[in-house]
């Protein structure tokens, strides 16, 4: 290399800022910029991934949220009670602190409509479709609530994903045609895991699933209790409407009762066709007349275990409280 070339190389290496730029950390934010978070994503993890992760629900390390319904001894909803009228018991211990308590009559809804489209419901399927469409038209508010439609026989089928467009939802309901066997538990599991959990929440939201079925299941890969667990993880209240028209409660009706009871919902048994519409109307009214409480549990452990919830009314003689039976604690990161 000649002297002129060496001199040119030395000049270029000594230019201000060259060495500093090469050594500067790529993650250093500019003054006033918001640094990139190093925390894990807050989106629910993919429950289908075999990584042992626990799907998130509305539970923080120091706060639990639960929605509940109160009725009097005649079954009429009670909507004017105060925080002092209740005690929250978490895993057999009173809550350390009540963070908030109020009547929730106007929270946005995420509603999943699960319709049994197996051969066993063929006789009254058309009427149930029209009742479901009327419910969606009356309940879903444009720009505020969202709903989806899933039909199931041997497998679940999403005929309309989450939308606030009631016309599209109605079309999704009318697309369903009865036929085939019944995989009820798989459908509930799928709706909670693959739809509700993956959708997440943009803010305070109430989740509800309305399940129309006779409660019979002959094809599912998951069990009833696994389906219930996934609904609890998704923080979904499940309302069940029986399509059994025999006039007596069978084994399927007991399944529907179990699912509703475990998630804080309610089971309806409309033995006459016109009662299906009444059941939908009851659900619509209840979704707008519930209570919401956030509290700090005692001796909380972020270990992924199931913790029981009991909302106790001070006047137990006259009031009945209906809430989900518990929740799965998140796992500490």
Could you describe each region identified by the protein language model?
Residues 19-333:
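Scaffold/interface architecture of coatomer-like assemblies
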């Amino acid at each position: 290399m000649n002297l002129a070339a060496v001199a040119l190389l030395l000049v270029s290496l000594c230019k201000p800022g060259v060495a500093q730029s090469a050594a500067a950390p790529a993650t250093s934010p500019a003054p006033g910029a918001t640094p990139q978070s190093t925390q894990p994503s807050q989106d629910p993890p993919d429950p289908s991934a075999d990584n042992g992760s626990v799907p998130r629900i509305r539970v923080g390390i120091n706060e639990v949220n639960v929605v509940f319904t109160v009725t009097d001894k005649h079954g009429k909803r009670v909507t004017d009670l105060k925080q002092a009228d209740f005690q929250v018991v978490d895993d057999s211990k009173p809550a350390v602190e009540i963070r908030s308590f109020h009547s929730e009559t106007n929270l946005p809804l995420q509603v999943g409509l699960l319709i049994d489209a197996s051969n066993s419901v063929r006789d009254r399927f058309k009427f149930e479709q029209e009742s479901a469409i009327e419910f969606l038209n009356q309940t879903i508010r444009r720009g505020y609530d969202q709903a989806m439609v899933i039909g199931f026989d041997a497998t679940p089928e999403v005929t309309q994903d989450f939308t606030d467009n009631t016309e599209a939802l109605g079309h999704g309901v009318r697309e369903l045609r009865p036929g085939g066997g019944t995989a009820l538990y798989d459908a509930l599991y799928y709706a909670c895991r693959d739809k509700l959990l993956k959708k997440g929440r943009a803010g305070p939201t109430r989740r509800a699933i309305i399940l129309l079925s006779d409660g019979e299941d002959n094809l599912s890969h998951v069990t009833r209790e696994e389906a219930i667990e996934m609904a609890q993880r998704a923080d979904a209240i499940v309302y069940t409407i029986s399509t059994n028209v025999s006039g007596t409660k069978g084994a399927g009706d007991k399944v529907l009762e179990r699912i509703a009871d475990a998630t804080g919902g309610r089971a309806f048994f409309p033995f006459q066709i016109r009662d299906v519409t009444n059941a939908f109307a009851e659900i619509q009214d209840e979704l707008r007349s519930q209570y919401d409480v956030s509290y700090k549990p005692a001796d909380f452990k972020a270990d992924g275990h199931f913790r029981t919830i009991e909302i106790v009314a001070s006047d137990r003689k006259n009031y009945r409280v209906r809430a989900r039976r518990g929740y799965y604690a998140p796992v500490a990161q």
